[in-house]
Amino acid sequence: MSIVIGADAAGLRLKEVVKDFLEKENFHLVDVTAEGQDFVDVTLAVAAEVNKEEQNLGIVIDAYGAGPFMVATKIKGMVAAEVSDERSAYMTRGHNNSRMITMGAQLVGDELAKNIAKGFVNGKYDGGRHQIRVDMLNKMC
């Protein structure tokens, strides 16, 4: 499993905080950030890498998280969530089988961002009754 991470200019600093944290937790990180990327381009790059392997997860950071979320939800087979708290990050894995989260550097601080990332990457899909909704989401794109 790889954690694919990316950010636009507004999310660069927080991306490095999250990246360093996850590397210290022994996760394999793939950073697809390129200088001057818009949130649209970085979200597409993260999604492309996430979709290469079933187990891969993605994190995109910009100023507010809304833009990358909108982009991610346009991608076939991508279930994504915009999160700004630990519980939502964990639960979106458990109930929605989300493979990508977005967050805003203007909304969350360093410690919260690390906790959000930790909740997301440690969350496990519960399946069962939740699969009905996941199937519905996947049919939409």
From Swiss-Prot:
Listed Gene3D superfamilies: Sugar-phosphate isomerase, RpiB/LacA/LacB
Family: Belongs to the LacAB/RpiB family.
Domain of life according to the entry: Bacteria
Secreted in keyword set: no
Reactions accelerated catalytically: aldehydo-D-galactose 6-phosphate = keto-D-tagatose 6-phosphate
EC category: isomerase
Designated name of the protein: Galactose-6-phosphate isomerase subunit LacA
Keyword Isomerase: yes
Entry coiled-coil feature ranges: none
Pathway: Carbohydrate metabolism; D-galactose 6-phosphate degradation; D-tagatose 6-phosphate from D-galactose 6-phosphate: step 1/1
Complexes and interactors: Heteromultimeric protein consisting of LacA and LacB.
EC numbers, comma separated: 5.3.1.26
